UniProtKB/Swiss-Prot annotation:
Any single GO BP term: cytochrome complex assembly
Residue span of region Disordered: 134-173
Encoding gene per record: ccmE
Lineage, opening ranks: Bacteria, Pseudomonadati, Pseudomonadota, Alphaproteobacteria, Hyphomicrobiales
Principal localisation: membrane
Protein name listed in UniProt: Cytochrome c-type biogenesis protein CcmE
Organism of this sequence: Methylorubrum extorquens (strain CM4 / NCIMB 13688)
Amino acids binding heme: 122, 126
Length: 173
């Protein structure tokens, strides 16, 4: 073999090993990729039953029904469409009607989303980007987490005194 043919064989072998490694990585990742959908996308696209995805939106007011053995039924809405959800387990402490959530699970034949994980928003300004985009597209987005700015505490509100200041005032005799 000539030097040139050995180099070509080595390059081809390295290319084959890299292609195999890339194929293994992609096949391993395909099982862990879970897509996010809003209720409007679920209604419009007709998601196939058994497809695993994340459903994000707001818990519809008046929809939470607690059953025996930690069974909970509620509806998730993006104000354009609503998807019924069934979940069994402990809900996050921040879960309540009107709050943003992301649930992971599958859609059954009847159109009910069977969640195995429910995540609630964790501060008053957080909302999943996809949910916020869907609300903005519908013209229903409110800046500041939907709270009335006039009810917010003024920035120069009195702050509680520190222990040092209080002790300093008392020690003067």
């Amino acid at each position: 073999m000539t030097r040139k043919s050995r180099r070509l064989i080595l390059i081809a072998a390295c290319g084959a090993v890299l292609a195999l490694a890339l194929g293994l990585i992609l096949s391993a990742m395909s099982g862990s990729i879970v897509f996010f959908r809003s209720p409007a996308e679920v209604a419009a696209q007709g998601v196939a039953p058994g497809t695993r995805f994340r459903l994000g939106g707001l818990v519809k007011d008046g929809s939470v029904k607690r059953g025996p053995d930690q069974n909970v039924e509620f509806a998730v809405t993006d104000t354009n469409a609503t998807v019924p959800v069934q979940y069994r387990g402990l809900l996050p402490d921040l879960f309540r009607e009107g709050q943003g959530i992301v649930a992971e699970g599958t859609l059954d034949v009847g159109g009910v989303f069977r969640a195995d994980t429910v995540l609630a928003k964790h501060d008053e300004n957080y909302m999943p980007r996809e949910v916020a985009d869907a609300l903005k597209a519908q013209g229903r987005w409110q800046e500041g987490g939907g709270k009335d700015a006039s009810k917010a505490a003024p920035k120069d509100a009195a702050k509680p005194e520190t222990a040092d200041a209080t002790l300093g005032q008392r020690s003067e005799r």
